[in-house]
Amino acid sequence: MMSGEVMLVILIVIGLIGRSPIIATAASILLVLKLTALERFFPTVERRGLELGLLFLTISVLVPFASEKISWKDVTPLFTTVVGLTALAGGAIATWMNGKGLDLLRSEPHMIVGLVIGSIIGIVFFRGIPVGPLMAAGITAFVLKLWEWFGSR
């Protein structure tokens, strides 16, 4: 086995130990592509994979609107209550941070390993819930920006 395969197997094991089926499945799919000489698809997956993942995530979030489980009556309190306005602000801040996380992952793709291991530590020792690398990367980008800002003073 070469280093790429070894890294993917390690990520599969980390995903299984950390109860992160998405990491384990993603690494497994990439390992199968690599072992079946379908590596030619890697550049396309690398270039469009995040966009496709975000598309499916957005579709899943919008399903309650399409299935009419959420109506206008459910939406109006968002703009008239403290809880609703706080939820709107939280969603806006979270998506902004996710965008910063995406920028960080695009410029520093090797950071995914640290984010995955950190997520596993959070799951195992703090009973956290894995929500994906974007939020972890967003928080990391925010902390790095704070470090840069305070470090330059």
Swiss-Prot record:
Mind telling me which GO cellular component terms the entry cites?
A: plasma membrane
* Cellular localisation: Cell membrane
What keywords would UniProt list here? Answer: Cell membrane, Membrane, Transmembrane, Transmembrane helix
Q: Is Glycosyltransferase there in the keyword field? A: no
Annotated membrane topology is:
Multi-pass membrane protein
Q: Does the keyword Cell membrane apply?
A: yes
Where does the chain cross the membrane?
A: 6-26, 52-72, 77-97, 111-131, 132-152
What coarse category fits the chief subcellular location reported for this protein?
A: membrane
The UniProt family comment states: Belongs to the UPF0756 family.
Protein name per Swiss-Prot or TrEMBL: UPF0756 membrane protein BBR47_23170
- Which species is this record about? Brevibacillus brevis (strain 47 / JCM 6285 / NBRC 100599)
